[in-house]
Amino acid sequence: MDPSPLLALLLLLGAARALSTCQRLDLEAAKKKRIEAVRGQILSKLRLTAPPPASETPPRPLPDDVRALYNSTQELLKQRARLRPPPDGPDEYWAKELRRIPMETTWDGPMEHWQPQSHSIFFVFNVSRVRAEVGGRALLHRAELRMLRQKAAADSAGTEQRLELYQGYGNASWRYLHGRSVRATADDEWLSFDVTDAVHQWLSGSELLGVFKLSVHCPCEMGPGHADEMRISIEGFEQQRGDMQSIAKKHRRVPYVLAMALPAERANELHSARRRRDLDTDYCFGPGTDEKNCCVRPLYIDFRKDLQWKWIHEPKGYMANFCMGPCPYIWSADTQYTKVLALYNQHNPGASAAPCCVPQTLDPLPIIYYVGRNVRVEQLSNMVVRACKCS
């Protein structure tokens, strides 16, 4: 057996060790470490080298406007947390394959309906090809529609238009996806739109064609049918004749969908990972949950008791939480490099070749504090651990 590949992998794992801070800690040690980290975070975020000196006289009652500002900030943060999309699952860890699926470029037969118009252009894709390239819906991680805005002529440089992207349905209806202002410049520019949800629908449905429409924004007061002509030129829609058409097809950069998907051979790992819930507070703090692996661990920090601080008026403390637990479901017993990892750990017992349990979602913390007799309201970023991941 040639030892070269094995040695190369061991060297790579040695480099990875230098980037890892993952260490085994008992629960009490982890709590103490988190409390000290919070102490340093708060002081550094407020640009303080030490806690403000305590006032000799008790602080006056909070002004109504300060209390109102603090309460409204808390409500806004709660609303944002409710609307926040769920964190990425464990499959975020794995490398993704990139698949390039160009749009259809013939305008005859059933495609004749999708010829470019003065104010709109259409991107038509063979959904059967998308399914063959990507595989199942569960394997798709992200999809982007990419197109090249061609450089503008000297007399139209600086032109700016509001363009809107829509997804087409079989019943001739359209769903708005994205809008953006695009400026024509003297250089080519790649434009990209997130179409992950649309491609997910293609992979789940039975449609033969998937269609996107890019249109010039039509102000409401003008009414439908009165949109400006599209002055932004997208490569791939030029109409050539005769021999020039075949030559142009070879060299033009047509719009395409870039699909990022897990390889099909990793479907078993994906299926196993998706059986796990998101490692957030809803799951980790749920009734009956006794998760031994990576999860959010509860930790309430009392500013007076744990930090010996009296200068923070509100809140009196907060749920800081922390991440803790092994990550066995990524480096499992059936992983192909298990033997190599075991050999590496044998020679490097203090190393951690496996991923670490680290924060994935963090929320801010609003506080009211005094500097002398002056009251201030501040929002401290990334203070509350809401979800963890293995990385």
UniProtKB/Swiss-Prot annotation:
Region Arm domain: which residues?
A: 64-270
Spell out the InterPro entries in the cross-references. Answer: Cystine-knot_cytokine, TGF-b_C, TGF-b_propeptide, TGF-beta, TGF-beta-rel, TGFb1, TGFb_CS
Keyword Signal in record: yes
Processing after translation: Transforming growth factor beta-1 proprotein: The precursor proprotein is cleaved in the Golgi apparatus to form Transforming growth factor beta-1 (TGF-beta-1) and Latency-associated peptide (LAP) chains, which remain non-covalently linked, rendering TGF-beta-1 inactive.
SUPFAM superfamilies this protein is in? Cystine-knot cytokines
Region feature (Bowtie tail): 221-249
Q: State one Pfam family annotation.
A: TGF_beta
Q: Where is the signal peptide?
A: 1-18
Listed as disulfide-bonded, the cysteine pairs are 284-295, 294-357, 323-388, 327-390
Please list the residues annotated as glycosylated. 71, 126, 171
Sequence motif Cell attachment site, residues: 241-243
Q: Name one GO cellular component term.
A: extracellular space
What family does the Swiss-Prot or TrEMBL record give for this protein? Belongs to the TGF-beta family.
- This one is known as Transforming growth factor beta-1 proprotein
Its source organism is: Gallus gallus (Chicken)
